[in-house]
Amino acid sequence: MCWLLLWGILHTCPTQASVLLAQQFPQQLTSPGYPEPYIKGQESHADIEAPEGFAVRLIFQDFDLEPSPGCEGDSVTISTRGTDATRLCGQQGSSLGSPPNQMEFVSSGRSLRLTFRAHSSKNKVTHLHKGFLALYQAAVSQPNGDAEAFTTPGANPPEIQNHCPGPYYKEEQTGTLSCPSSRKWKDRQRGEEVPECVPVCGRPVVPIAENPNTFGSSRAKPGNFPWQAFTSIYGRGGGALLGDRWILTAAHTIFPKDSIYLRKNKTVNVFLGHTDVDELLKLGNHPVRRVVVHPDYRQEESHNFDGDIALLELEHRVPLGPSLLPVCLPDNETLYHSGLWGYISGFGVEMGWLTTKLKYSKLPVAPREACEAWLRQRQRTEVFSDNMFCVGEEMQVNSVCQGDSGSVYVVWDDRALRWVATGIVSWGVGCGKGYGFYTKVLSYVDWIKGVIECKDRCPEA
């Protein structure tokens, strides 16, 4: 029997129904399994009822359904007595469908029905579409058919508390939302429209196991490095998830130093969410919407890797979970102190062979003077700028090799209690013993944030 009395979440029987009571404070309503990808071949109905004399107000905070012309495929339908039903599908920026954006739905009576349909498919799991997250609330019904939200005592305009689905998301700005005369929910302190739920970074569900041999590589367990990306452009490379839509990587994986085609990259393929290459390929490529390479990167200068950093914006947000979580950005120089230990993970060459499993190594931040002396002894001409740092020990095995480029070096931030990507695998002198040289992410944090937060006239590669 799939008739359930719930207070906010649809469960996952193939066809199901729920009756929800709208109250003074907003409650969450999500698609089955949100924020994990929803399963094909199911249908859910939620009838939301308000007390006598009140209406139902519904606002979507997140919406990500598979797009289709006219929303004939997967869809959410909003219906209320006396009005035409509204069918929604797609996601932000979709060229197909009709996503709700920040639309507000208010019932004409005291009830509203939401129907979620995911059509049957040979592939039971959709293409990593996570469904929806909505807030519903009772609102005072007015004679003219309008509605006003319950007023928090002493609050003018009306206010509600913002909530996000943990543990993978948190409120961008904790506190209260208000509904002024514009009838759009805004952050009371900053005056912005409904704040987004932002991903929690740097906190894997599965702790990283200590490597008893200290040096050398170990096989990663699922969830150890949930930010790890596998890229395929001019060959295999790596990267790290930032937020739920961006990949941090090295510029030279996109525009290689030895390429005869300057500033012309091939198709960029990004795979996420597993520690096995074969399984990653089965999960499918995440299409890239935009490639942004740092302006200081000089592809034609073979001995200068300054500015070796790039960002890949994915077409769609990815559903976060134990195997797919973002890493954090650094915010202070103490994370680069000599002797501080960190981890590097990747799918690079090991003992001359390409690996199909994610490996990781524990390596220390090296003294800058030691790395400079090491380069001089070998008469190397590569630029070692202040935007770089080095990792490893001169006489110990350095397991980083071809195929690891773009992957990140992470250290534990004792103050913030999270893993931070301080470096990006950039260049080295062969594989084996010695030091590896990394892009210093701290030097580029302002640039990274500027690109990610850009809304107009954004830079392209």
Curated annotation (Swiss-Prot):
Pfam families in UniProt: CUB, Trypsin
Domain named Sushi: residues: 138-199
Signal peptide: 1-22
Record-linked SMART domains: CUB, Tryp_SPc
Main location: secreted
Entry GO terms, CC: blood microparticle; extracellular space
An individual GO BP term: complement activation, classical pathway
Glycosylated residues (UniProt): N265, N332
Cysteines joined through disulfide linkages: C71-C89, C164-C197, C371-C390, C401-C431
A GO term for molecular function: serine-type endopeptidase activity
Active-site residues, record numbering mapped to chain: H252, D308, S405
InterPro entries in UniProt: CUB_dom (IPR000859), Peptidase_S1_PA (IPR009003), Peptidase_S1_PA_chymotrypsin (IPR043504), Peptidase_S1A (IPR001314), Sperma_CUB_dom_sf (IPR035914), Trypsin_dom (IPR001254), TRYPSIN_SER (IPR033116)
Domain Peptidase S1: 214-453
Keyword annotations of the record: Complement pathway, Disulfide bond, Glycoprotein, Hydrolase, Immunity, Innate immunity, Protease, Secreted, Serine protease, Signal, Sushi
Gene3D superfamilies in the record: Complement Module, domain 1 (2.10.70.10), Spermadhesin, CUB domain (2.60.120.290), Trypsin-like serine proteases (2.40.10.10)
Record SUPFAM superfamilies: Spermadhesin, CUB domain, Trypsin-like serine proteases
Recorded superkingdom: Eukaryota
CUB domain: residues covered: 23-139
Cell location: Secreted
CDD domains listed in its UniProt record: CUB (cd00041), Tryp_SPc (cd00190)
UniProt-listed Enzyme Commission number(s): 3.4.21.-
Family designation: Belongs to the peptidase S1 family.
Function per UniProt: Mediates the proteolytic cleavage of HP/haptoglobin in the endoplasmic reticulum.
Name the record gives this protein: Complement C1r subcomponent-like protein
Gene this protein is translated from: C1rl
